[in-house]
Amino acid sequence: MARLRKQLPFPELGVPWKMLKARIANFGQKLPAWRDKRAEHGELRLIDDVPVVHVRGTPQQMGRALGELVGEQTRKLYDRYIHMFAPDVKGDMLLAREMEPRLPAAFKEEIRGFGEASGLGYEQALLGQCFLDIHKVALCSTLVAHDSATTTGEILLGRNLDFPSLSIAHAASMVICYEPEGQRRYSGITWPGFLGLLSGMNEDGLALAMMLVYGHKRSEHLDGQPFPLVFRRVLAECSNVNEAVKFLETRPYCTTTNVMLADKGRHAARVQLHMKKAIVDRSSPEKPALACTNHFLEKGYRSFAFTWFSSTLRLGHLRRAIASGVKFDVDRIKALLQKTAIPAINIQRIVFKPERLEYEVAFGHPTTGKRRYVTIPREALFAQATPSQAAEVALSSRP
């Protein structure tokens, strides 16, 4: 049944009904409160009420540390979100097992460590990593601008995450910072129990934000890696946009998505990840701004989904903002994110500043209104990392 359900067209049509059921079932449910906490290989601290988790060491050590730090929130989220959204846990577990052989050994070690320390166990933890490939359930909007398109010239990447909260996920957003032993440090925005990343940035100043693309059920498969893991690997293994594009062109994924890339060298690319091809559109000094939502743009790769109506409307807003010629700054990007937020499911807004190695996040109840942003500074993400010289010059010249 799970396999048949995954192959059915237009899964997005079932989401409003699931949201309504969960709103009733989760009435009064609350995520356990976040609090400062330490583990042998990590710590959780609150920055202006935003949970920021650091884990370090081997994959198993990082998994165990994360499980110890957010296990309580993870168990609640699995119970009131994953099992509520998709009650056929047994069927979904069979699909997750199909994806398991394609997972890197190190990632499986991390899942095992996380499952043991969080109290979920390995199988439930594995299901969490495959959940978003089995159940496509997010809509997003992104915009990147740099050089002549921004007031200071620095590169900025803004993203909306529109994701059904089911009355609980909005309270579970967190920042995770990975410090793997002897390797590149990277960070991202996620939820407890989800070890992959949908948005993030590494210490080399490479940032990304992904968007699901609907309408391609016939070509999608399970013979690949979960897309949140793929994007986490981009941040772990690549230092700039060029390297990220080369990695994505190997097509390790099995679900159609778009991704916006930006690096502190003021390079950006919109990459449309079709099953047959990664379609790359790069920015340039002559084209210093790009926008993207939830559909493919190239003829021959498009396919209808009911999300197309919202996706094209949001893309139109972003493109008109670019075409206006008005330069972008952080406040203008925030205003655009508010304008393109989807009612009832907008739970995260993020502005990445790769040259400063920092970002601003706004989490909370679904809303299309204004949000309060919290800056997660370089010192909290990547201690002792160095921002770009171009950013220092641009910022020092501001009036």
What name fits each language-model region?
Residues E123-G158:
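Gly/Pro-rich turn-and-neighbor structural signature
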Residues A2-S118, D147-L156, N160-P399:
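C-terminal, well-structured catalytic/ligand-binding subdomain of enzymes
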